[in-house]
């Protein structure tokens, strides 16, 4: 756990530096310099590329995490494991490329009526997909080598800095829209190159394929698992459907969703680091048949994620009003408050229970993943098609939340019945009760105290003073409650509680 903690902390620092840069960019640059349609365009381009890249992986990322323990051998550079991880994604990219050209005209027709900007730049999707694909593959290779901090910095910080530069260049009229979109997409090319160079500096990878080590039995096992897990990438990417379907109704809706989604996605940030560094450890425990360790790690990750996600959701929610009052053109995006709530709940559920997906994928029962992912994907698509016309931008967030519920209930049931693995504990119930109590107290604040602040005026100063007092008071209450609850030794240490 020492390595996990060390890399998680470094990764978390990169994540939150990226959040700071992203927050400044999103709330004070993008909303000021770009129209809602232009914001929606960048969102749809990235989401579509990430979805295509996920499918093009052909399950490679899951295979890296599952099979690396079998290949691990420092003396032979892991039997050329890195070289193997480059082949399947390239095959997948070729397949996606062929399908893209076959259905290109259909995609253009789908968006031409309400989102013609997408049609103008659809040609950039393939190169953007390629770089998004290998950026992720290189990042996963770094993860199994327990060197996740630098790739996290690249994903969370470097890309955001490069995007910020492109926003400023376009916003101040230094480049045209065409050049801006190319620069925006090029940030992923730079990130891919940096990740590759970093892997090479580790001195632990080799392009030489060890054909003698990979016998027919192992090759068959890897290929079957990899192809089976192709659909599994959709589990972590169902939110990508939201902007893609919203764009059908117009890029303006996708732009509103982008701003709200950025706020809600803060909730998932801790898991990006903790999940990436704990997954290889859990994979090793599953390979060793040490289910007691799997249970311990799974509950530990799940409990900590529930705590952090719940607190983040609460403090984001109570500060939404002041946030939209501060950002440029905030009145144009305030309709996204419902998205923040429902997508925030979806992110809380996913970050708390997502480790269950990894446990199943690493086990001998991974074949069930195809069933669950198919259920999740079908639910997400159908719910988006049904709810967006009825509830607009909030319907897309509700579709994600409901789809996750449909997905995790049978998944957790299977884990318990087949592996006797459970992610739940009494401490998690305490966290839920604390969160509900805080939301209830916030409701009382809105009813009794907010009118008193309104009597003092409606200016920005009054809004900020109330927000600071509310956040400070509830922060003190939350910390005091957590000190009494003793959620875990790690939480107690952070809160400076002596055992």
Regions found by a protein language model. Give the residues of each.
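Helix-terminus/linker motif at the lipid-water interface of multi-pass membrane proteins
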Residues: 23-38, 108-111, 234-266, 281-285, ...
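Interhelical loop/hinge segments that connect adjacent transmembrane helices in multipass membrane
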Residues: 1-4, 173, 177-183, 195-240, ...
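Helix-loop junctions and terminal segments of transmembrane helices
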Residues: 27, 57-73, 144, 260-303, ...
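Hydrophobic alpha-helical transmembrane segments
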Residues: 153-203, 261, 374-379, 393-414, ...
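Transmembrane helical elements of multi-pass membrane transporters/channels
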Residues: 7-23, 159, 183-199, 216-284, ...
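Signature of the first transmembrane helix
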Residues: 3-62, 92-101, 128, 224-251
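Membrane-proximal transmembrane or re-entrant/amphipathic helices at the cytosolic face
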Residues: 443-499
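Interfacial/gating helices of multi-pass transporter permease domains
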Residues: 29-51, 117-119, 177, 181-182, ...
């Amino acid at each position: 756990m020492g390595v996990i903690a060390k890399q998680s902390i470094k990764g978390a620092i990169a994540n939150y530096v990226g959040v700071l840069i992203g927050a400044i960019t999103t709330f004070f640059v993008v909303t000021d310099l770009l129209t809602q349609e232009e914001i929606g365009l960048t969102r749809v381009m990235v989401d579509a590329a990430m979805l295509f890249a996920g499918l093009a992986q052909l399950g490679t990322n899951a295979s890296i995490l599952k099979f690396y323990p079998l290949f691990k051998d420092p003396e032979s550079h892991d039997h050329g494991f890195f070289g193997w991880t480059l082949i399947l994604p390239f095959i997948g990219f070729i397949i996606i490329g062929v399908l893209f050209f076959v259905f290109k005209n259909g995609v253009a027709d789908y968006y031409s009526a309400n989102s013609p900007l997408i049609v103008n730049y659809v040609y950039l999707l393939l190169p953007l997909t390629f770089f998004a694909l290998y950026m992720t593959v290189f990042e996963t290779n770094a993860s199994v080598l327990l060197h996740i901090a630098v790739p996290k910095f690249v994903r969370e910080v470097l890309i955001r800095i490069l995007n910020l530069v492109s926003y400023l260049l376009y916003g101040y009229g230094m480049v045209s829209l065409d050049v801006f979109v190319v620069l925006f997409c090029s940030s992923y090319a730079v990130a891919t190159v940096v990740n590759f160079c970093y892997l090479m500096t580790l001195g632990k990878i080799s392009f030489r394929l060890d054909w003698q080590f990979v016998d027919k039995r192992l090759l068959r096992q890897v290929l079957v698992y990899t192809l089976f897990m192709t659909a599994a990438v959709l589990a972590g990417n169902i939110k990508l459907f939201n902007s893609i379907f919203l764009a059908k109704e117009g890029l303006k809706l996708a732009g509103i969703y982008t701003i709200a989604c950025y706020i809600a996605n803060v909730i998932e940030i801790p898991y990006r680091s903790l999940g990436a560094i704990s997954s290889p450890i859990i994979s090793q425990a599953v390979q060793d048949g040490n289910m007691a360790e799997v249970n311990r790690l799974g509950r530990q990750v799940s409990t900590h994620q529930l705590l952090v996600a719940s607190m983040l959701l609460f403090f984001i929610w109570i500060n939404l009003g002041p946030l939209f009052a501060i950002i440029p053109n905030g009145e144009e995006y305030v309709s996204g408050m419902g998205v923040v709530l429902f997508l925030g709940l979806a992110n809380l559920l996913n970050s708390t229970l997502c480790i269950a997906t990894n446990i199943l994928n690493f086990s001998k029962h991974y074949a069930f993943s195809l069933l669950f992912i198919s259920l999740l994907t079908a639910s997400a698509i159908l719910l988006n098609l049904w709810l967006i016309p009825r509830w607009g931008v909030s319907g897309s967030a509700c579709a994600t939340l409901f789809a996750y519920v449909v997905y995790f209930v049978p998944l957790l049931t299977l884990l318990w019945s087949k592996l006797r693995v459970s992610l739940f504990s009494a401490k998690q119930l305490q966290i839920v009760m604390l969160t509900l109590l805080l939301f209830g107290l916030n409701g009382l604040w809105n009813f009794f105290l907010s009118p008193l602040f309104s009597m003092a005026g409606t200016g920005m100063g009054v809004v900020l003073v109330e927000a600071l007092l509310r956040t400070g008071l509830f922060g003190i209450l939350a910390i005091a409650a957590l000190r009494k609850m003793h959620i875990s030794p790690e939480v107690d240490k952070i809160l400076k509680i002596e055992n």
